[in-house]
């Protein structure tokens, strides 16, 4: 049974921890399909430093996440280059093998979705059975092909109230 890896990336929004709660809830409901859920401390940088924490499959421990702003696991704005030009993918591959990762969940905005896309192409090129999924969140509302994303509404509300 493969394990899952979740990472937060980009600017912390009022909803990024809510997304993490949703991931934990999905994990708890699918422990027959997912062995362990790991969270990377400080996004992709945590993966590169092997700085992962195991998230327990006990939803009651994480109830506060639904209402907690910020990024509890920390975040990163590190951008990966193209796989053929960036040797950091080798380290990411080593970590994925070490933890028997079958699913990588990248929570963030435009740059984070770019990272998810690059990771997906990298693992596909290696013919690795690793599913990479982007979980959109952005205060900028700059993800193409979307009307709006989680994080945008709360950012607009905050700015509007701040200038009134």
Label each residue range with its predicted role.
Residues 1-4, 32-35, 67-70, 99-103, ...:
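Short coil/turn connectors at secondary-structure junctions
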Residues 1-51:
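N-terminal phosphate-binding or glycine-rich loops at protein starts, especially the Walker A/P-loop
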Residues 9-11, 40-45, 77-78, 109-110, ...:
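Short, ordered loop/turn segments at secondary-structure junctions
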Residues 15, 104-106:
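Short catalytic-loop micro-motif centered on adjacent basic/acidic residues
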Residues 16-17, 49, 115-117, 144:
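Short glycine-/acidic-enriched loop or helix-start segments at secondary-structure transitions
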Residues 19-23, 110-127:
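Short Gly/Thr/Asp-enriched flexible loops that form oxyanion-binding sites at enzyme active sites
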Residues 25-35, 42, 78, 97, ...:
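Generic secondary-structure signature for well-ordered alpha-helical cores
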Residues 50-102, 111-113, 135, 139, ...:
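Glycine-rich oxoanion-binding loops at beta->alpha junctions
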């Amino acid at each position: 049974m493969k394990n899952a890896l979740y990472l937060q990336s980009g600017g912390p929004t009022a909803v990024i921890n809510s997304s993490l709660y949703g991931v934990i809830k999905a994990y708890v409901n699918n422990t027959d399909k997912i062995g362990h859920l790991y969270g990377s401390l400080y996004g992709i940088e945590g993966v590169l430093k092997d700085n992962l924490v195991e998230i327990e499959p006990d939803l009651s421990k994480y109830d506060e996440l639904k209402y907690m702003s910020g990024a509890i696991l920390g975040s990163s704005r590190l951008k990966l280059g193209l796989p053929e030009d960036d040797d950091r993918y080798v380290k990411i591959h080593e970590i994925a093998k070490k933890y028997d990762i079958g699913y990588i969940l990248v929570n963030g905005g435009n740059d984070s979705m770019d990272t998810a896309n690059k990771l997906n192409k990298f693992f596909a090129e290696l013919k690795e059975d690793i599913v990479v999924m982007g979980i959109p969140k952005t205060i900028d509302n700059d993800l193409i092909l979307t009307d709006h994303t989680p994080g945008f509404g709360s950012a607009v509300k905050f700015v509007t109230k701040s200038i009134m």
